[in-house]
Amino acid sequence: QRAPGQLSGGMRQRCALIRTLATDPRILLLDEPFSALDYQTRLSVSDDIHNIIRREGKTALLVTHDISESVSMSDRVVVLSARPGRVKAIHDLSELRGLTPMQRRDHALFHTYFNAIWKELELSA
């Protein structure tokens, strides 16, 4: 029972996703969806959004500069070069499929993927 301006950042993100899902889109575009959230809220909301997307059987395109976020939320990570943006590499994260973002962060392969993506970004800098 709060006015929209009184909601926390995490609740606003959840409401935005629910509002988007109400239109029943086939594909969701999530452009830096967690950038305005503190770290603890970011982890909680990412699990919630991941679960909603899976439950609803949706495809989501996540745009982020946060490597941890990309590995924890995605089935596939596409690394782009600097301008002009071209596909530099594609990482298939199928070994992590079925895990929540929090579970992925604890998985041994999380750091392997993170480091591989980081190295590619360093090379393009």
Predicted feature locations:
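Catalytic Walker B motif of ABC-type/P-loop ATPase nucleotide-binding domains
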Residues: 28-31
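Conserved H-loop
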Residues: 57-63
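Hydrophobic anchor residue at the start of the ABC signature
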Residues: 17
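Conserved signature/switch motifs of ABC ATPase nucleotide-binding domains
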Residues: 2-5, 23
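Conserved beta-strand-loop-alpha-helix hinge in the C-terminal portion
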Residues: 82-112
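Conserved catalytic segment of ABC-fold P-loop ATPases
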Residues: 72-79
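Helical segment within the ABC ATPase nucleotide-binding domain
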Residues: 42-57
